[in-house]
Amino acid sequence: MNIEELPLPSLLRDFLISKRGIRTLYPPQEEAIRAGLLNGENILMVSATASGKTLLAEVAAVNNVLVNDKKSLVAVPLKALAFEKLNDFNTYSELGIRVAASTGDYNSEDKWLGSYDVIITTYEKLDSLLRLKPSWIWNVGQLIIDEIHFINDDERGPIIESIVAKLRMLNLNPQIIGLSATIGNPEELANWLNAKLVKSDWRPVSLREGVYHKGVVTYVNDGEKRISGQGDSLINLTVDTLNDGGQVLVFSSSRQGAVRIARKLAEYICSSPVRYIDPGEAGKLAEEVRETSSSRILAEELTGLIKCGVSFHHAGLELEVRRVIEEGFRRGVLRVLASTTTLAAGVNLPARRVIVNEYRRYEPGYGFIEIPVMEYKQMAGRAGRPGLDPYGEAIIIVSSKDEVDYVIDKYIKSPPEYVKSNFMNPTSLKFHTLSAVASQYAETIDELVKFTSNTFAGFQGKLSAMIQANSVRRMISRIIDELVDYGFIIRNGDKLEATEVGAVVNRMYLDPDTAHVFIMGLRNLNSDADLNAYSLMLVVKSPKIPKVKVRRNELDELAQQAASMWSSIPLKPSDVDELVNYPEDYEDFLSEFKTAMALLEWINESNEDQIMKTYDVQPGDLRVLSDQAEWLIGALQELARTLGLSGNVVNGLRALRYRVKYGVNDELLELVVNLEGVGRVRARALYAAGYRSIEDLAKANVSDLTRIRGIGDKIAGSIIEQAHQLVKDGRVIKFNESTVKGKTRRGGGGLLDHMY
């Protein structure tokens, strides 16, 4: 099918042909068009990576905006993917399409999004918006759910289900387009979505899959190939591809494994007499990584590898560094990338040969377990660059001959696992039950049962039988009892209503169990506690905070340190002596304590390398940790305000939230909060030079500021201009001493005194 044949507005059709160079559709794209994609039909598209799902979603979204004058929502699982989609959709800006991405601030309605046509969010952010119901939500005509196989995920899956259920309860009836490469039961998922299924195995580049053992690749339906070389499997497979002009993507089950692989391959490539890279381009990329990274340690490691045309890639690297590395691989400057499986989750980064280094990974408490088939399919889907590679290869390395046939049958010949709902697990059901009541999607248990029936769980046979047997009603009733006990919901006859506190818990996107723990911690807050340490040790109890692993040789030191800070530890173990003896039960507590200490180092301006050395928290992990902690400290602040705690506590939490966000001491808050382009390093330099307020900077000259290390003419001009405008408009945000010190005295007669 040609683009000229599509029922599209002429300006979109002309744009696709003249600017994007697209004249014909791939077979799966044509099938989706014939199924009614451009006519408002719900579509579930399950097709291989690089088969055109992304382009089709873009065309459908832009068409919806131009033809129907409606907004299009694009929901993705990861922040990194949201910004990749933002870049993709921004190419349509010359058609007048306004595109925005929103991934954080769960308690904000984001009214500003009303000015945009295509809105890209994470699943969580979209669910939070549907709780708040901003006015623009009523003009949504389309929902695109990217990577919809995440419905199988324990945490994100129920959120996808909640989004669909809420849209149905609002009677918005937007067109729903689900996209995935790997679903074992797409018919069932399509039926739940009331969607037409477009399923295709077609690929623009053929895929050869095989298993490697002792120098031989056994392909499925394609015989065997002997790989020349001595000894190491990874080196042999990598060099075989490089000699043929291809790139290699190696997947490892762990970060340490990815780093080890990158080191080994870089050493071989750099010592090889064969020239595989352009040294000049590799040097430029290495320098860009050095300038982007906040960690000198990681920058040194990466630049050495990149100069050999190799890099590693995992979530411990900052997002900005990962983007530089990804772009270097796309441009062919990097020939080999060693990554954890997180790279397979949606980021568009294909290679000639994909190598799966191991099909088992270590899970604490379980030992080594086999990866899911779906995960392998996601990795294998990265093989083959359309327009660049004549074929793609996905090869799994095994250590014994007996594994060859087993792995072929298990991973290559088998379909991915069925996706299933996780909505009915107690934690998820409690979270979404409070949401349904507090956001007025349901006011009775009957309506909650109806809400649940709109989820994927409600569609699947097991839950249907449970509804008929009234067991779902009993589950929901028990959860309501618990939410009433927590003080989040009240009963008024058959009617259910969120309390003021319950409404805050819902608006802040807290799960009820975590909110209950927070309230208990606020109740126990006393004047002896250091508010910052106490609050950080309270929020790290949330399951949303990734915990720092404790090594056995750290237990004694951490236990002693915790004992020395006993008055600032909320909801602590009952006996200091028991803690010092660190029985097994206390290891989780010490992990929380270590995590809080890492955050304390961050807000006290320790540099990223020092935090990484002391706490084994890499820069990317630190960003995630600070992002999550900022959100949870903000939630704690709102709870403290609602519960009637003193203004000093509320203001202290407000200051702490910003300190966690920016990683600064309290004296720098005014600079980092008010000024764009001024982070912790630049703010400290300004402060040390005597510029301690916005008013000081408003009086400065460019020549004064450029004497400060790290500040050039452009940055200096921007800082002064911002400061002038803020002072002129009276918009300077101030943090006085009582605000930042955050005394812990509780207010009297507040809601907290009546809840427990």
UniProtKB/Swiss-Prot annotation:
GO MF term list: 3'-5' DNA helicase activity; ATP binding; ATP hydrolysis activity; DNA binding
UniProt superkingdom: Archaea
Catalytic activity line of the entry: Couples ATP hydrolysis with the unwinding of duplex DNA by translocating in the 3'-5' direction; ATP + H2O = ADP + phosphate + H(+)
Keyword Transferase appears in the UniProt entry: no
First and last residue of the signal peptide: none
Helicase ATP-binding domain residues: 34-201
Protein keywords: ATP-binding, DNA damage, DNA repair, DNA-binding, Helicase, Hydrolase, Isomerase, Nucleotide-binding
Gene3D superfamilies (alphabetical): 1.10.3380.30, 5' to 3' exonuclease, C-terminal subdomain (1.10.150.20), P-loop containing nucleotide triphosphate hydrolases (3.40.50.300)
Pfam families (alphabetical): DEAD (PF00270), Helicase_C (PF00271), Helicase_dom4_arc (PF21280), HHH_5 (PF14520)
EC identifiers of the protein: 5.6.2.4
Biological process per Gene Ontology, one example term: DNA repair
Record domain Helicase C-terminal: where: 233-435
S-S bonds: none
Keyword Isomerase among record annotations: yes
SMART domains: DEXDc (SM00487), HELICc (SM00490), HhH1 (SM00278)
Short sequence motif named DEAH box, residue ranges: 146-149
Subunit-structure text: Monomer.
Role played: DNA-dependent ATPase and 3'-5' DNA helicase that may be involved in repair of stalled replication forks.
The family this protein is said to belong to: Belongs to the helicase family. Hel308 subfamily.
This protein's name: ATP-dependent DNA helicase Hel308
Source organism per UniProt: Caldivirga maquilingensis (strain ATCC 700844 / DSM 13496 / JCM 10307 / IC-167)
Organism classification: Archaea, Thermoproteota, Thermoprotei, Thermoproteales, Thermoproteaceae
Gene name of the encoded protein: hel308
